[in-house]
Amino acid sequence: KVPTTVDINVTNNNVVVKGKFGTLERTIPEIITIEQTDGNLIVGLTNETRGNKALHGLYRTLINNMLVGVSEQFIITLVLQGVGYRASVQPKSLVLSLGYSHPVNIDIPDGIEVEVVQNTTINIKACDKEQLGLFAAKVRSWRPPEPYKGKGILYKGEKILRKAGKSGKK
């Protein structure tokens, strides 16, 4: 189902989706067919083999993510847990204080909005779900959560399996 606020243009193997939050473009393989009828987008196959069925599901989901992204945007929230862990946004970069001897500067790619709430919560918004996930993973890779003290950068709602420390010799 295509939202009314979204324009779709399918030419050859190229899909262009325009909406309130931006424009996304993706090239699809020739085995995938796309038809527009009555506000619906139908993704089909030219021949059905096991590998082609997998690609069919993949591209159906990718196109659906494009439709949702340009009409609503995707949001990932990261939480910084640890003493002295802070974040701030400067034009075109995210500055993190993560216990290193220097602040960590991460360049914000085009099409991604970053907002810091209360110094320890980072909201990342984008219409491209793939770019959003890659950027969030890049930020998280600077301090992944560790199981002993529970410090690090976590996705909102993520639970860290805690481990007991070493039991000393007695």
List each model region and its residues.
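N-terminal intrinsically disordered, cationic/polar leader segments
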Residues: 1-68, 72-137, 141, 146-170
